[in-house]
Amino acid sequence: MDGKQKPDAVKQADVKQAGVKPAGVKPAGVEITEVARSLAAVRPSGNAARLIAEIRTLEDQKSALAARQARLSVAFDLLRRREQADAGMAAADLGAGAAAQIALARRESPAKGNRLLGLAKALATEMPHTLAALEAGQLNEWRATLLVRETAGLTAEDRAAVDEELAADTGTF
């Protein structure tokens, strides 16, 4: 969404397409917080292989959480645009403030919020295989960022083709 769509262009279907569960579903944030607290209370122990295995598992979970943040960011942006359109905001101004709020939630600068939202939109709309690989822990958020950044000059169709080609070779991710 570039903010130039008509107000009726932001629909609930867009939020569903972003991969976020509909309203009424208990958010995972409570469970995630409980898991984080539990992990913080456990002292590292075990042999070297066990420690490395846990580090890998945690890295995979970080990737899955980054993918979830991307989906939530896209859904939030779409929801904000719809609310602003319903309030009569000019089409060119739709989405104002969304990236800054995402940045605040992620404890990042407002400028980085624009980059994070751009990354999320690219993954959700043009690079679904990269997003799926991120969710599966096949690559981390930084590597996903590099893929999005290096394909930024391509058309949406070409970017999607690169995404599909890279997905065929899971070792690439």
Model-identified regions with their sequence ranges:
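Peripheral, non-cofactor segments flanking catalytic/redox cores
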Residues: M1-F173
